[in-house]
């Protein structure tokens, strides 16, 4: 596959739509549509920016999961605390801010921050980082945006396994929840 052209087709408040023109294996042109959170001016810009973080937080042997209303699918699903990096914000600062804003919890310690990975590679060049952290404090929604509807709670491995079987999850949260339920990580 050879990328021939990158063209912006829409500039939204948060998302920018692009058409990528490729030459496929048969020598024919293929138009591929993507969205990006960042301004892309040339092909080398694709997939270079880290845009956010997903946080797997634990406390006293339990995993933090958020039951959150997601506008794109018009329903609630289980997910991780997560958010976008603000301008000039470090990943560590983003973790602390998002954890507090979405749950009222404080960051006790960072266990591991993984290198950036693509979060929605079929439709976007967005890269995020997964962080495993230990949280402390009391869950509260008083710092949450009016545009977010989140119910945060900590769950035991057994409760997490039951939720995986009966509830709808984001894919990243589902994988982390399963690993947690099988003892693959803890604080």
Kindly give the residue locations of the regions a language model identified.
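Short amphipathic beta-strand and strand-loop transition segments with alternating hydrophobic
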Residues: 1-11
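Nudix hydrolase/Nudix homology domain
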Residues: 6, 72-77, 83, 87, ...
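Acidic, metal-coordinating catalytic segment for phosphate/diphosphate chemistry
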Residues: 10-54
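Conserved Nudix-box catalytic region and its N-terminal flanking loop in Nudix hydrolases
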Residues: 49-97
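Active-site segment of metal-dependent pyrophosphate-handling enzymes
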Residues: 58-60, 69-71, 77-79, 100, ...
């Amino acid at each position: 596959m050879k990328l021939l052209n990158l063209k912006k087709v829409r500039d939204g408040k948060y998302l920018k739509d692009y058409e990528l023109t490729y030459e496929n294996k048969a020598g024919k042109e293929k138009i591929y549509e993507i969205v990006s959170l960042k301004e892309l001016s040339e092909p080398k810009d694709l997939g270079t920016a880290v845009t956010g973080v997903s946080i797997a937080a634990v406390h006293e042997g339990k995993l933090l999961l958020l039951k959150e209303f997601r506008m794109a699918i018009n329903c609630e699903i289980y997910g991780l605390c997560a958010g976008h990096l603000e301008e000039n914000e470090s990943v560590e600062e983003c973790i602390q801010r998002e954890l507090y804003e979405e749950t009222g919890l404080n960051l006790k310690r960072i266990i591991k921050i993984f290198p950036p990975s693509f979060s929605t590679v079929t439709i976007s060049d967005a890269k995020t980082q997964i962080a495993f952290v230990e949280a402390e404090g009391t869950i509260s929604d008083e710092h949450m945006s009016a545009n977010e509807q989140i119910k945060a709670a900590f769950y035991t491995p057994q409760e997490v396994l039951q939720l995986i079987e009966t509830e709808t999850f984001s894919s990243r949260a589902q994988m982390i929840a399963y690993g947690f339920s099988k003892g693959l990580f803890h604080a």
